[in-house]
Structures are given as C-alpha cells and as structure tokens.
Amino acid sequence: MRGAFYTAIALLIGRSQTAKEIDQTDVSKPYLNVVAIGGKGTKTTPKRYLRDGLAHSATNEERVKANVLSKDAMDLAAEGKDWLSLRLGTVDHSHTPQLKRKVDRLPAITQRRIEKKLTTAKQRVYDRQVKLDDPRYPEYLEMHHNFLDIPKMPPGMSLAEAVVMYNMVNWQSGSIPTGKKATNHLSHLAGRSPLRDVNKALDPTFVAKASEDQLRNAYFVKLQIMYAKVYDFCHSNGCTKKELVSPLEQKVEAKETKLLLPLFKN
C-alpha cells in the first residue's frame, strides 16, 4: 500500500518536469507581451516574455498610461475635424471652433502692425500738413508765391516746404540756419519725406543715376539752401506770424517795415 503511494508521487513529479521542459522549448510566440492581472489605474507592472522564457518587469520608461494617450488622441481628432470643417466651409459662425479663432486672430494682429509701420513714416513727413480746409490756406499760398520770387532761390519749392520753413523762421529759439536745431529739423525732413517727393525736388538726370542715399543727401543740401534764403528774406522783410511775438517782431518796428507778404489782411 505504501509502495503504491510512493509510485504515484514519483509519476506526478516526472510529468510536471516533462511539461516544464516542453514549455521552455516552445518559441512559437517569443515576443508576446502580456499585462499581469490588475484593473485600470492600479500599480500593476506590465511583464514581457523574452526568448528564454523568463518574465521580466517593464522599466518605468516603458509604462504608458492609457488615459494620457486617449486624451491626446481625442484632442488631435478634434483639431483635425475643425481644420477639415474650415477647409470645406461647413462651420457654423455661431459655433466657431477654437482652432479657427486662433488662426484668424494672428493675421489680424500682424496686419495692424504692418499698417502702423507703413503709416508712421508718412505721418512724420512734415510737422504741419497743408490742407485745403486750413483757414490760413490762402495766406500760405501767397507766402509760397513770394518765397519762389526770392533771388537765387532753388527751383521747385513746394507749398509744404514753404510752410515748414515759415514756421522754422518763427521759432522762439534755434531758427538760425547753421544752428543744430534747424539742421536736425531739415535732416529729419529729408530722411522722412516720401521718395517720390524727393525725386520731384531734384534734377531728373541726377535722379536717374543716383541711389536713394545720394538722393536724400542732395535733397537735404537743397533744403538747407532754401531755408537760408527764406531766413534772410524774412529777417529783411518781417514775414512773421501774426499770433506770435517772435524775436523778429521785437527787432523790426511795424511802422518802418514794408510788408512784402500781405498775410495778415483784416
């Protein structure tokens, strides 16, 4: 009786060893990845069966949370759907997707910055723009005409240039043509003027050959010559602003001054 029991135990041990040897030689699925038993969100470690049949725990870098992948996939799918709707023109304006709002907002900001850059330089051309609705426009026209008649005045003085120089003559200080203030003002005018206005003020033959820097330098020299003529003319004839008490008016007595520029008619 006891011998039969030992014989049965030996048979069971032999069978288990044979099954283990067969399982180790089975390489039909050497790269099968399985996850140990455990629910979602648990700390169960995934395991991998390698060629040698031994199970090894995955490293921390190999662990991937399913909920993170799911969220990224959903966001990508939503953005793709919005983009496709925009391309096909099927988006209702009352429910504009977030992607469309981001895409439309950037060009608008860029366009405003570009327009500001383009208009800033033009707005700085002259300190005072001459307009037809200016109440002193008729006076400026007559003053401009008289400036053109100044002896040896360079040709082509514009109305805007005449008004700028007329204002410079009546500065409370720094109106001398060779002074730093007047020189900087004329240099600013030459550098900020539209190139088409610069070309009109210069000889066409020179304009055809010169670079932009050469054109603006030549225009600056011409402005200096014109202002020197205007300065001498106004200090000899008293062409000053009626509403200001300038140094010129303090030097010249009104009774002894013969006004060649009838700007202040009553």
UniProtKB/Swiss-Prot annotation:
It comes from the Eukaryota. Residues 1-18 form the signal peptide. Keywords: Host nucleus, Secreted, Signal, Virulence. The keyword DNA damage does not apply. Coiled coil: none annotated. One of its GO terms (cellular component) is host cell nucleus. A motif (RxLR-dEER) lies at residues 48-63. It is found in: Secreted; Host nucleus. The keyword Secreted applies. Secreted effector that dos not suppress the host cell death induced by cell death-inducing proteins. Belongs to the RxLR effector family. The RxLR-dEER motif acts to carry the protein into the host cell cytoplasm through binding to cell surface phosphatidylinositol-3-phosphate. This is Secreted RxLR effector protein 128. It comes from Plasmopara viticola. The lineage of its organism: Eukaryota, Sar, Stramenopiles, Oomycota, Peronosporales.
